[in-house]
Amino acid sequence: MCAGTMKIISPSLTNSFFRCTLRFVACLFWIGYSQGTTHVLRFGGIFESVESGPSGAEELAFRFAVNTINRNRTLLPNTTITYDTQRINLYDSFEASRKACEQLSLGVAAIFGPSHSSSANAVQSICNALGVPHIQTRWKHQVSDNKDSFYVSLYPDFSSLSRAILDLVQFFKWKTVTIAYDDSTGLIRLQELIKAPSRYNLRLKIRQLPIDTKDAKPLLKEMKRGKEFHVIFDCSHDMAAGILKQALAMGMMTEYYHYIFTTLDLFALDVEPYRYSGVNMTGFRILNIENSQVLSIIEKWSMERLQAPPKPDSGLLDGFMTTDAALMYDAVHVASVAVQQFPQMTVSSLQCNRHKPWRFGARFINLIKEAHWEGLTGRITFNKTNGLRTDFDLDVISLKEEGLEKIGTWDPTSGLNMTDNQKGKPANITDSLSNRSLIVTTILEEPYVMFKKSDKPLYGKARFEGYCIDLLEKLSRILGFEYEVRLVEDGKYGAKDDSTQQWNGMVRELMDHKADLAVAPLAITYVREQVIDFTKPFMTLGIGILYRKPNGTNPGVFSFLNPLSPDIWMYILLAYLGVSCVLFVIARFSPYEWYNPHPCNPDSDVVENNFTLLNSFWFGVGALMQQGSELMPKALSTRIVGGIWWFFTLIIISSYTANLAAFLTVERMESPIDSADDLAKQTKIEYGAVQDGATMTFFKKSRIPTYEKMWAFMNSRSQSVLVKNNEEGIQRALTSDYAFLMESTTIEFVTQRNCNLTQIGGLIDSKGYGVGTPMGSPYRDKITIAILQLQEEGVLHMMKEKWWRGNGCPEEESKEASALGVQNIGGIFIVLAAGLVLSVFVAVGEFLYKSKKNAQLEKRSFCSAMVEELRMSLKCQRRLKHKPQPPVIVKTEEVINMHTFNDRRLPGKETMA
């Protein structure tokens, strides 16, 4: 029948059947050829989920990466990647091991995931045994003797990331840091930071976040109570999102708090509610969003991700690519780069119970470790020994009003490089203060802060006026902030109680963040700088002594002696005695001071000297009293003495006369104290300061003996000498024998308006008033710049003139004249002494010269003539002496005549030939 059938078939039908058969065989051949040239590899992925539901970001990124590689065909033109994904419960290591064995039995070139350590370690041990690469995108603790040779991790090495956090802490100059971690591995990850206190001046406090719940409010409450403003949170992004929401509800999202998050997903969090809170929030980002190709891939991812159901309460922006997703995307591409280098690689089914490793596994893992790829997270290279990613770039991001912005970079080689100040837009000091409302604490103190006098009721800041109020208004105009003025509750400036170690006053309110600024006469001191910050001083001053003015005393009966000091009076008396004696001696020695008392008888051999001892004293008195004495010196030496004495008396009398009028007309103000030393040496006059003020603290902390003694006095009588405020101290200084220690600027203000008070002595110390801010306040530097601007423009000086200038007290006609001392007119005594010495030398010269002339005249030796002259000069009571005569020749008749006329003396006219 068959043959018959064959026979009845026509040739045309036979040819058609033959052609169809050939075509069918050709198709089968092409399919077989195609299957032989197209390489197919399978990747396995194990992902964790809390419960059955939508796929997580890592699983979606894994599929997205595989599909992208297969679509583009650029990386693997002749290889098709397939995948097998499995889901397990969190921390289920047994289920993870079972799923890994299932995938290995199917034949996979590598296994990606799971994320958590316990499950990852179980899968890692299986991969090590069977020689299959295990690729991780989460941090896993690596022990020093790590033997996971088939392991690579794309997550940045946390020892490097810990150094990045430490560099950031040092850049911000933090002194106290709190670390809050969510599991025990956080202490391992942050080991570089935990070791920091031993190497840096850093105080570290470590707290653990709640494990079984996301309620962090109890922990945040403890941080707020402990004033922990610098906190590092080591937690997942969903935990970070919950912490931010709870911190906002607790009032911990202010400019005084600064948070650093270790999660690399900070950029993906919804920070819209916190943009204008003023909180400082810093973190790191590894996703290279500045690359246009990366942005293109993220856009495609976002489009596909938005089609998937969003994960509830994740805290992430919908469709935003997380770091885990980006790392998984890069991990698939890195494995594909290794596949490209090993095209002949094939996979085989592996059984967990046989322990027969994959023959291509060792080479494949080495190719993965040697791979280089510029991915979504930057450059990717591995340490060939441990498979860790140690070379990477991080962007430092910070919360601004525009959102999270890049402010710097960090890499393991160069470290931290902050670029926030190098942006295109210029820095503006009003950026952090514009349109903000600040609480300002102050204290009533004239003329700084006072209640404004008005007939109408005043409210708010309009109730106050004064220097500090004007300063606050100027600052608000420059910086653009609003403010509310509140008086400090306890009425104190701020001091530390030694027994309780607690602060009070305005300092306490700043420490408790009840106020943003303290604008008052608040002195900048060392102890206050330990707990709060200060701006540069807007006023410099010191501690002075306020005391009532002493009563004036009328000039006394003997006030005419006051123009010259007692020393000068004594020196004048000694000078008078000395000059008189010198004049007497010189007049006796000088031959030219002897004269003929009978001018009509020029032949008389008797000469006379007017300068007896009494006459010499009389001559000195006459010159001193500006009167004549009828005694005129004739010799040059005596005239020198007289002239120099007259010059001396001229200066003395002129000085005395000039100073006498002041002493006779001015009421002398005699004060019992003139300085702090005078106060310390006595106990009759009480003295004190404002309790718990900067002045009291100065004496309390001083180590200068005088001030220590003063503090001992004040401390022993603290109930009576320490006052509550300046007004009480001023009133006590007016009404009792009390010296009030206070700031010099306030003393200046008080003495301008109360003429019965005055400042005693100079300043005891030097300090300044500054605007106080809480520790670490971002406003301090901005306010400092504004204060310097006001200072340079002269505004601060004009404000001081406005509030300090009063009616003024009537000026005294003249100040008390001080007695002239040796330093004033001592030179005239030197001139007097020089004149006396000169006159002595001249007198000696005259004496020698005259002795020589007499020796020649009397024809005898020079020595005998000098002795004779000296003998006659030393006869102090004699005014007469014989003139020297030449020898004469006497004739006989003249002798007879002499006997006859015995009442006449020898004329002695003839001389020997």
Swiss-Prot record:
Pfam families according to UniProt: ANF_receptor, Lig_chan, Lig_chan-Glu_bd
Assembly and interaction partners: Homotetramer and heterotetramer with GRIK5. Tetramers may be formed by the dimerization of dimers.
Sequence positions that bind L-glutamate: P521, A523, R528, A694, T695, E743
One GO molecular-function entry: extracellularly glutamate-gated ion channel activity
Protein's GO biological process: detection of cold stimulus involved in thermoception; modulation of chemical synaptic transmission; synaptic transmission, glutamatergic
Function comment: Ionotropic glutamate receptor that functions as a cation-permeable ligand-gated ion channel, gated by L-glutamate and the glutamatergic agonist kainic acid. L-glutamate acts as an excitatory neurotransmitter at many synapses in the central nervous system. Binding of the excitatory neurotransmitter L-glutamate induces a conformation change, leading to the opening of the cation channel, and thereby converts the chemical signal to an electrical impulse. The receptor then desensitizes rapidly and enters a transient inactive state, characterized by the presence of bound agonist.
Underlying gene: grik2
Species, as recorded: Xenopus laevis
SMART domains recorded: Lig_chan-Glu_bd, PBPe
Listed transmembrane segments: 567-587, 644-664, 825-845
Activity modulation: Cold receptor activity activated by temperatures between 10-19 degrees Celsius.
Gene Ontology, cellular component aspect: kainate selective glutamate receptor complex; plasma membrane; postsynaptic density membrane; presynaptic membrane
Domain of life (superkingdom): Eukaryota
Swiss-Prot/TrEMBL keywords: Cell membrane, Disulfide bond, Glycoprotein, Ion channel, Ion transport, Ligand-gated ion channel, Membrane, Postsynaptic cell membrane, Receptor, Synapse, Transmembrane, Transmembrane helix, Transport
Cellular localisation: Cell membrane; Postsynaptic cell membrane
Disulfide bridge partners, by residue number: C101-C352, C755-C809
Chief location bin: membrane
Family statement: Belongs to the glutamate-gated ion channel (TC 1.A.10.1) family. GRIK2 subfamily.
Keyword Cell membrane: yes
Catalytic activity: Ca(2+)(in) = Ca(2+)(out); Na(+)(in) = Na(+)(out)
Residue numbers on the Extracellular membrane side: 1-566, 665-824
Residue intervals on the Cytoplasmic side: 588-643, 846-913
Protein name: Glutamate receptor ionotropic, kainate 2
Membrane topology: Multi-pass membrane protein
Glycosylated sites: N72, N78, N280, N383, N417, N428, N435, N551, N756
